[in-house]
Amino acid sequence: MTLLALGINHKTAPVSLRERVTFSPESIEQALTSLLQQPLVQGGVVLSTCNRTELYLSVEQQEHIHEQLVSWLCEYHHLRPEEVSKSLYWHHGNEAVSHLMRVASGLDSLVLGEPQILGQVKKAFAESQRGQSLSGELERLFQKSFSVAKRVRTETEIGASAVSVAFAACTLARQIFESLAELNVLLVGAGETIELVARHLREHKVRHMIIANRTRERAQLLADEVGAEVITLPEIDERLADADIIISSTASPLPIIGKGMVERALKARRNQPMLLVDIAVPRDIEPEVGKLANAYLYSVDDLHAIIQSNLAQRKAAAVQAESIVQQESINFMAWLRSQGAVETIRDYRSQADQIRAEMEAKALAAIAQGADVEQVIHELAHRLTNRLIHAPTKSLQQAAGDGDVERLQLLRDSLGLDQH
């Protein structure tokens, strides 16, 4: 048995190819069933996200396993092998182990150290558990990878600093305001960045969120998820004074929030401070707003400066994280190798027990027929000894006959002959 990881990710293929090899949540169960029907595949996990599609497998050793798995992947997704073969990567044994640990810890992510990938790996693992698609080795590997990811989070600073625009915007808000729990937030736009911002803010339990968007339909989907109120862009003017924090990210070619609008809001707020974070390009908020007293305006460039500084901190933390992964992968491989000994010991004990049971049955039968008990016990001990030492004796004779000194010494060590 060997552990194998193969996949395609943001570093090896463009999105135009990645989207063609992705597995939808609805298809995972069927894909696992199909995968385990392949010859010599003993267990599998399918991890599929927007940035990667990976298969983690326990397989029997086979010379053409690569060709077999590429063929399965291409048939499943209706692709030609030449379309994907150059973008696929393969990891075996220790490399497969350390790769999964790196993935779960966020060390292989597009955004270094991002935490979302761990949840995605756990979900993929749970899917295989439900479908009974795991081998014992794979189950142990994934459980170990989860504990490694936890170690990386707790023992390093890999996730302490914001390295995405959305996360940086929320981090900035938490730095300026002591608590977000009593604050109202206005989000302008309903695209991917605002979605991430809204989810971050929900985690920090802001008092109230308002989402302003050109169309209500798209905003309503997000609002339903995070528990927010929806307004249209023209309604911003009358609701701006309600907001302590404004975060804007639209595709508008012209500013949506002007200096006059903010002046009116500040007056209505009796000059209570407002934080405005403009992460749109072109800008959604007129730059002159930053000159107003009690209006604290930050642009996407300000956030990028924060991100670059924090990214350097994450890269430094990643060195420590890689050391954790390296040590844990070595420990796991030592455990995996020991499983071969466990099976051998189990077989050896089973063989010895079978011999004992056979000799015992003969002895009891002899006693039942009236044989002398002392003589039966003597013969039992003699025959049992001969049966148990028969195979080791043949191995010793073979090694001696071949002049194999190393093997002879290994057998002596195994039998404990030099311990007394």
UniProtKB/Swiss-Prot annotation:
<dbReference type="InterPro" id="IPR000343">
    <property type="entry name" value="4pyrrol_synth_GluRdtase"/>
</dbReference>
<dbReference type="Pfam" id="PF00745">
    <property type="entry name" value="GlutR_dimer"/>
</dbReference>
<dbReference type="InterPro" id="IPR036343">
    <property type="entry name" value="GluRdtase_N_sf"/>
</dbReference>
<dbReference type="InterPro" id="IPR018214">
    <property type="entry name" value="GluRdtase_CS"/>
</dbReference>
<feature type="site" description="Important for activity">
    <location>
        <position position="99"/>
    </location>
</feature>
<protein>
    <recommendedName>
        <fullName>Glutamyl-tRNA reductase</fullName>
        <ecNumber>1.2.1.70</ecNumber>
    </recommendedName>
</protein>
<keyword id="KW-0627">Porphyrin biosynthesis</keyword>
<dbReference type="GO" id="GO:0008883">
    <property type="term" value="F:glutamyl-tRNA reductase activity"/>
</dbReference>
<dbReference type="Pfam" id="PF05201">
    <property type="entry name" value="GlutR_N"/>
</dbReference>
<dbReference type="InterPro" id="IPR036453">
    <property type="entry name" value="GluRdtase_dimer_dom_sf"/>
</dbReference>
<feature type="binding site">
    <location>
        <begin position="114"/>
        <end position="116"/>
    </location>
    <ligand>
        <name>substrate</name>
    </ligand>
</feature>
<dbReference type="InterPro" id="IPR015895">
    <property type="entry name" value="4pyrrol_synth_GluRdtase_N"/>
</dbReference>
<comment type="similarity">
    <text>Belongs to the glutamyl-tRNA reductase family.</text>
</comment>
<feature type="binding site">
    <location>
        <position position="120"/>
    </location>
    <ligand>
        <name>substrate</name>
    </ligand>
</feature>
<dbReference type="GO" id="GO:0050661">
    <property type="term" value="F:NADP binding"/>
</dbReference>
<comment type="function">
    <text>Catalyzes the NADPH-dependent reduction of glutamyl-tRNA(Glu) to glutamate 1-semialdehyde (GSA).</text>
</comment>
<dbReference type="Pfam" id="PF01488">
    <property type="entry name" value="Shikimate_DH"/>
</dbReference>
<keyword id="KW-0521">NADP</keyword>
<feature type="binding site">
    <location>
        <position position="109"/>
    </location>
    <ligand>
        <name>substrate</name>
    </ligand>
</feature>
<dbReference type="InterPro" id="IPR036291">
    <property type="entry name" value="NAD(P)-bd_dom_sf"/>
</dbReference>
<comment type="pathway">
    <text>Porphyrin-containing compound metabolism; protoporphyrin-IX biosynthesis; 5-aminolevulinate from L-glutamyl-tRNA(Glu): step 1/2.</text>
</comment>
<feature type="binding site">
    <location>
        <begin position="189"/>
        <end position="194"/>
    </location>
    <ligand>
        <name>NADP(+)</name>
    </ligand>
</feature>
<feature type="active site" description="Nucleophile">
    <location>
        <position position="50"/>
    </location>
</feature>
<dbReference type="GO" id="GO:0019353">
    <property type="term" value="P:protoporphyrinogen IX biosynthetic process from glutamate"/>
</dbReference>
<keyword id="KW-0560">Oxidoreductase</keyword>
<dbReference type="InterPro" id="IPR006151">
    <property type="entry name" value="Shikm_DH/Glu-tRNA_Rdtase"/>
</dbReference>
<comment type="subunit">
    <text>Homodimer.</text>
</comment>
<feature type="binding site">
    <location>
        <begin position="49"/>
        <end position="52"/>
    </location>
    <ligand>
        <name>substrate</name>
    </ligand>
</feature>
<dbReference type="InterPro" id="IPR015896">
    <property type="entry name" value="4pyrrol_synth_GluRdtase_dimer"/>
</dbReference>
